[in-house]
């Protein structure tokens, strides 16, 4: 899966501005796909040159022109080829998990702080994902497969929260024992 595949999928439903596409990467896709802001616009430019998308400049009064991107027939073929291609293994990288794995080499208090940070950031992400889910359900904007995807994200975050909180409790007991 590449940023190009995700952008083509986004444009399968409707034409969007670069800003709207970037916003979807930062909200909807941020839970399972990581694309930096600096890759989106160069990818759009490359895709336009390859004939996968077209760009239309929309004139706006008092504001800069807006570029709206649409998928071409060639882009649709490319996207469908991606959708039917074999699944790739999931890639998971986590600085927090790496530090936790090697946590025996630093103070327990620091590891507890890391876990507490994990709780806080996961709670924030979970709240945003739940709002996204409720908004999508109430506005009938989500397909069944999108609903399943978001439900998986919610369940994963809830499970992560339980483990993080239990970890804080375990390390707090360890800290008291070493006391």
Residue ranges, per PLM feature:
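Long amphipathic alpha-helical coiled-coil segments
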Residues: 171-179
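Amphipathic alpha-helical dimerization/coiled-coil segments
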Residues: 81-124
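Alpha-helical scaffold segments that form or flank carboxylate-/histidine-based iron centers
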Residues: 39, 67, 144-154
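Acidic interhelical loop/turn segments
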Residues: 131-150
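Heptad-repeat amphipathic alpha-helical coiled-coil interaction surface used
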Residues: 112, 119, 123-126, 133, ...
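Basic helix-turn-helix/winged-helix DNA-binding cores
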Residues: 1-92
């Amino acid at each position: 899966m590449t940023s190009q595949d995700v952008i083509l999928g986004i444009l399968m439903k409707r034409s969007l501005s670069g800003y709207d596409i970037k916003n979807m990467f930062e909200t909807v896709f941020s839970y399972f796909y990581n694309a930096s802001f600096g890759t989106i616009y160069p990818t759009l430019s490359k895709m336009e040159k390859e004939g996968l998308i077209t760009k239309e400049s929309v004139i706006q009064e008092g504001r800069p022109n807006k570029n709206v991107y649409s998928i071409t027939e060639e882009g649709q073929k490319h996207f469908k080829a991606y959708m039917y291609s074999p699944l790739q293994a999931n890639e998971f990288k986590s600085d927090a998990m790496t530090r936790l794995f090697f946590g025996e080499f630093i103070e327990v208090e620091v590891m507890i702080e890391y876990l507490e940070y994990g709780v806080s950031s996961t709670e924030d992400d979970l709240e945003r994902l739940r709002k996204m889910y409720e908004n999508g359900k109430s506005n009938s904007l989500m397909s069944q497969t999108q609903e399943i995807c978001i439900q998986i994200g919610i369940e994963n975050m809830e499970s992560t929260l339980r483990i993080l909180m239990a970890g804080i409790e375990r390390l707090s007991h360890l800290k008291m024992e070493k006391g």
